[in-house]
Amino acid sequence: MAAKIKKGDTVVVLTGRDAGRSGEVIQVLPKDGKAFVRGVNLVKKHQKQTQNAEGGIISKEAAIQLSNLAFQDVNGKPTRVGFRILEDGRKVRFAKTTGDQIDG
């Protein structure tokens, strides 16, 4: 299945503790159906001291289900993503609310 949410997209969280917050997708895990979003779903991790890094408690992003994310259109609202095939044969994503093309 084609990816509706890709690395670098700006998304809005639909449900959960961070509902309504938006951020940029850092990484997508298609096999798990999850993604990492910058500044969303932060968890505290207890880091052990190493030669390179200090020990302590750090905040980092945890994975969030793709079903809880929606692409953010140019108006800043969540939208569904569809696919169109252009005249030259390329398959591109578009925002269903505005009809604007997302890719190339």
Curated annotation (Swiss-Prot):
Cellular component terms (Gene Ontology): ribonucleoprotein complex; ribosome
CDD domains: KOW_RPL26 (cd06089)
Gene Ontology MF terms: rRNA binding; structural constituent of ribosome
Pfam hit, one: KOW
Keyword Transmembrane helix: no
Record-linked SMART domains: KOW (SM00739)
UniProtKB keywords: Ribonucleoprotein, Ribosomal protein, RNA-binding, rRNA-binding
GO biological process: translation
InterPro entries: KOW (IPR005824), Rib_uL2_dom2 (IPR014722), Ribosomal_uL24 (IPR003256), Ribosomal_uL24_CS (IPR005825), Ribosomal_uL24_KOW (IPR041988), Translation_prot_SH3-like_sf (IPR008991)
Subunit structure: Part of the 50S ribosomal subunit.
Family: Belongs to the universal ribosomal protein uL24 family.
Task of the protein: One of two assembly initiator proteins, it binds directly to the 5'-end of the 23S rRNA, where it nucleates assembly of the 50S subunit.
Name of the protein in question: Large ribosomal subunit protein uL24
